[in-house]
């Protein structure tokens, strides 16, 4: 189905895709000549072959070191003024990603302290840190689509493991 639309790449995301063995799916997509991008918390072993991995860690289910080391991109959701420093302390020495995006947590996107902490961190540290924004939430595509599942609470659902 994806190949019929001739996309530049396919993104596997939603919930936590790595709770599944994705080898068969990625093999089939690669056979069709498609590049595959994975978005994950990094908390589980990645089973499948991906061309690009974006890791967005969650507080209560830390990412595996092997995933931190191999991810091309990291997305940190900044939910407090000290969040960036806390994540840097936890994972900074392991991460080898070329891009580390700092996104304000959606419900705090207008908080001057949060925005300033991102701005000052990027100014002080430069690459690989970049300021980002969760544009998909601004467009409300998920909340306006009757087929979409309810959103997950801030930071995930500890009872469900993500």
Regions found by a protein language model. Name each.
Residues 7-9, 18-161:
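Conserved AdoMet/S-adenosylmethionine-binding subsite of the radical SAM
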Residues 14-16:
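Short, glycine/charge-rich beta-strand/loop segments that flank catalytic centers
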Residues 1-12:
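Glycine/small-residue-rich loop that forms an oxyanion/phosphate-binding "nest" at active or ligand-binding sites
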């Amino acid at each position: 189905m994806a190949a019929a639309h001739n996309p530049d790449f396919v993104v596997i995301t939603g919930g936590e895709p790595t709770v599944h063995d994705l080898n068969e799916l990625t093999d089939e997509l690669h056979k069709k000549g498609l590049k595959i991008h994975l978005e994950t918390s990094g908390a589980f072993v990645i089973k499948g072959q991906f061309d690009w991995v974006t890791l967005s860690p969650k507080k209560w289910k830390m990412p595996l070191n092997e995933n931190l080391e191999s991810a091309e991109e990291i997305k940190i959701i900044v939910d407090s003024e000290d969040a960036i420093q806390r994540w840097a302390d936890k994972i900074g020495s392991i991460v080898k990603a070329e891009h580390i995006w700092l996104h304000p947590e959606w419900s705090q996107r207008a908080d001057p302290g949060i925005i300033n902490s991102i701005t000052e961190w990027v100014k002080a540290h430069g690459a690989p840190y970049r300021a980002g924004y969760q544009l998909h939430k601004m467009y409300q595509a998920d909340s306006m689509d009757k087929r979409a599942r309810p959103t997950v609470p801030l930071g995930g659902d500890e009872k469900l493991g993500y």
